[in-house]
UniProtKB/Swiss-Prot annotation:
Residue numbers binding hydrogencarbonate 2: 475, 479, 481-482
Protein name: Serotransferrin
Residues bound to Fe(3+) 1: 81, 113, 211, 272
Position of the signal peptide: 1-19
UniProt keyword annotations, A-Z: Disulfide bond, Glycoprotein, Ion transport, Iron, Iron transport, Metal-binding, Methylation, Phosphoprotein, Repeat, Secreted, Signal, Transport
Subcellular location: Secreted
Gene name linked to the record: TF
Residues binding Fe(3+) 2: 414, 449, 543, 611
Tissue: Expressed by the liver and secreted in plasma.
GO CC term (a single one): recycling endosome
Residues with Dimethylated arginine modification: 42
Residues binding hydrogencarbonate 1, per UniProt: 138, 142, 144-145
InterPro entries: Serotransferrin_mammal (IPR030685), Transferrin (IPR016357), Transferrin-like_dom (IPR001156), Transferrin_Fe_BS (IPR018195)
Length: 704
């Protein structure tokens, strides 16, 4: 055989000679069996994808070595469990999950399960009362049965930094923890039902091993609590009547029905995920490769090569139990993918010293957007005596993400962002009240405010029905009065999301910079580069900014009913506003008529929910306590706060809170949907297909 022919055949076998390096995914393997499956994967991909993407194989000795290899650009991808996804995301690795394995069907893919604590209904202890109880676990080192509950209980365990097993043995009166060190910690195996060498075995030889085994330990009365996953009760008790005998222990030390696992769980445990470099990580090529691969080699496909089978081992390259792949949204870093509870659990288990007792103290880290809010927040922090600290982000979605991750604790949001925050797992804590005063204010949340479309009185021909090709001014994309309500109404008329083509030009901070909806924006007076950003660096941002846009450039402004009044007749002394009269402006009615701005009650687009403070569920009680004290010290009820600090006043407009806030009122039911109301949630759900929110896409990735 001639050398040239021999070389071409070798290239065909290797699948590398003509492969474009940018279209080649270097898959990292950790064993000979994985390397062999990877080689088969490579050859079969070459057979079906002549133009790529291609696969090459890199062999290392451990997943941690693979993480380092990818970080150093010596490999491109590897599949990891949640704990290793966490390690991969930490500095200096800086990797991110790009593709998730899912279980179930394409129509209802599941990328996580809930770790729960199950108890019998006829008992009355809570999660913070488990000391001295008898516990049932799936197995040592397993997520739902060991890692999550031990992390949740970490601060209560005696000397956990010495040995988690010893700490657990001293915390519970007796346990069944299959796979535990029975000779060193006999109490961890005391409840197990296996005989002889099978007692506490790391397999089904121990009757109380695994999810069903741990639940059996509880059912048979051996234990008081079982740490399992949310589906375990349903799998073992198909009769709903039998399930009524059991309850879940919630993180807030309450109990709920086993049906309410989405509201009462210890942590959400994510599926295995493929990780890649955050920068230059080939995430689109990796997805293209795996998407093609699952179409040809996935579950129930006729090809001899199967992605989710491991003939010479178990879970080689991918989990054998996986049913397919889903692309992870680009905004989703490792912390958002894993979730706050799971990340906190992993952090606790990795503590090398006792938990800092100061973490138990109630203080609030407020998230400020941009320089002006940070300046006010720092001043607030100084007057608060340490109760308030400050964190900064460039925009609202970054702040929401920081609160989700525990990098910040709270902020006040309008209804549109509150919807996004709610979808991201945050809860409303206190509502801003704008009209109620006196003693009843803090106990009576208001119904909401009016969203209006404002025009100049001199533009007499403009009405709600002829806004096409007009110049529009918005508070920001995804905000209630400035975007969600008017664009939701507009969508119902034009049946598409091309709002940038409907208006001739506009300023809607948060829009793509090349959009016509950024054309009117003017940015910061301190220099260029801040045009159309959704924070106070854009002078047309927010209620006052959108109204200023109308005064200086636009035809219509979408704001709240009080905006015109607050910026006319001497109420705003800035140069652009000081000579304005409210009579110079009117509001548009949906029936095509117009009315004075003082008659907005009879001429508005819709009623929007008042702004509200949001936080994580675990921090909500602390936030409410601190803010009630802060408004007592610096709120509107204080006779003269100007010599110190005024919580509801700003040097510019609406920094941290709306300036017209009278008080922060307690909310009876702290869920985003009950606070926003059915009509508003329905409108937001309809408008979601027009949403450009990357954070909302990330937060809704894990389906309920």
């Amino acid at each position: 055989m001639r050398p040239a022919v021999r070389a071409l055949l070798a290239c065909a076998v290797l699948g590398l000679c003509l492969a474009d390096p940018e279209r080649t995914v270097r898959w990292c393997t950790i064993s000979t069996h994985e390397a062999n499956k990877c080689a088969s994967f490579r050859e079969n991909v070459l057979r079906i994808l002549e133009s790529g993407p291609f696969v090459s194989c890199v062999k290392k000795t451990s997943h941690m070595d693979c993480i380092k290899a990818i970080s150093n650009n010596e490999a491109d991808a590897v599949t990891l469990d949640g704990g290793l996804v966490y390690e991969a995301g930490l500095k200096p690795n800086n990797l991110k999950p790009v593709v998730a394995e899912f279980h179930g069907t394409k129509d209802n893919p599941q990328t996580h399960y809930y770790a729960v604590a199950v108890v019998k209904k006829d008992t009355d202890f809570k999660l913070n009362e488990l000391r001295g109880k008898k516990s049932c676990h799936t197995g040592l080192g397993r997520s739902a049965g060991w890692n999550i509950p031990m992390a949740k209980l970490y601060k209560e365990l005696p000397d956990p930094q010495e040995s988690i097993q010893r700490a657990a043995a001293n915390f519970f009166s007796a346990s069944c923890v299959p796979c535990a060190d029975q000779s060193s910690f006999p109490k961890l195996c005391q409840l197990c039902a296996g005989k002889g060498t099978d007692k506490c075995a790391c397999s089904n030889h121990e009757p109380y091993f695994g999810y069903s085994g741990a639940f059996k330990c509880l059912m048979e009365g051996a234990g008081d609590v079982a740490f399992v996953k949310h589906s375990t009760v349903f799998d073992n008790l198909p009769n709903p009547e039998d399930r009524k005998n059991y309850e879940l222990l919630c993180g807030d030390n309450t109990r709920k029905s086993v049906d309410d696992y989405q509201e009462c769980y210890l942590a959400m445990v994510p599926s295995h995920a493929v990780v890649a470099r955050t920068v230059g990580g080939k995430e689109d090529v990796i997805w293209e490769l795996l998407n093609h691969a699952q179409e040809h080699f996935g579950k129930d496909k006729p090809d001899n090569f199967q992605l989710f089978q491991s003939p010479h081992g178990k879970d080689l390259l991918f989990k054998d139990s996986a049913d397919g792949f889903l692309k992870i949204p680009s905004k989703m870093d490792f912390e958002l993918y894993l979730g706050y509870e799971y990340v906190t659990a992993l952090q606790n288990l990795r503590e090398s010293k006792p938990p800092d007792s100061s973490k138990d103290e109630c203080m609030v880290k407020w998230c400020a957007i941009g320089h002006q809010e940070r300046t006010k927040c720092d001043r607030w922090s100084g007057f608060s005596g340490g109760a308030i600290e400050c964190e900064t982000a460039e925009n609202t979605e970054e702040c929401i993400a920081k609160i989700m991750k525990g990098e910040a604790d709270a902020m006040s949001l309008d209804g549109g962002y509150l919807y996004i925050a709610g979808k991201c797992g945050l809860v409303p804590v206190l509502a801003e009240n704008y009209k109620t005063e006196g003693e009843s204010c803090k106990n009576t949340p208001e119904k909401g405010y009016l969203a209006v479309a404002v025009v100049k009185t001199s533009d007499a021909n403009i009405n709600w029905n002829n806004l096409k090709d007009k110049k529009s001014c918005h508070t920001a994309v995804d905000r209630t009065a400035g975007w969600n309500i008017p664009m939701g109404l507009l969508y119902s008329k034009i049946n598409n999301c091309k709002f940038d083509e409907f208006f001739s030009a506009g300023c809607a901070p948060g829009s793509p910079r090349n959009s016509s909806l950024c054309a009117l924006c003017i940015g910061s007076e301190k220099g260029t580069g801040k045009e159309c950003v959704p924070n106070s660096n854009e002078r047309y941002y927010g209620y006052t900014g959108a109204f200023r846009c109308l005064v200086e450039k636009g035809d219509v402004a979408f704001v709240k009913d009080q905006t015109v009044i607050q910026n006319t007749d001497g109420n705003n002394n800035e140069a652009w506003a000081k000579n304005l009269k409210k009579e110079n402006f009117e509001v548009l009615c949906k029936d095509g008529t117009r009315k004075p701005v003082t008659d907005a009650e009879n001429c508005h687009l819709a009623r929007g929910p008042n702004h509200a403070v949001v936080s994580r569920k675990d921090k909500a009680t602390c936030v409410e306590k601190i803010l009630n004290k802060q408004q007592d010290d610096f709120g509107k009820s204080v006779t003269d706060c100007t010599s110190n600090f005024c919580l509801f006043q700003s040097n510019s407009k609406d920094l941290l809170f709306r300036d017209d806030t009278k008080c922060l009122a307690s909310i009876a039911k702290k869920t985003y949907d009950s606070y926003l109301g059915d009509d508003y949630v329905r409108a937001m759900t309809n408008l979601r297909q027009c949403s450009t929110s990357k954070l909302l896409e990330a937060c809704t990735f894990h389906k309920p």
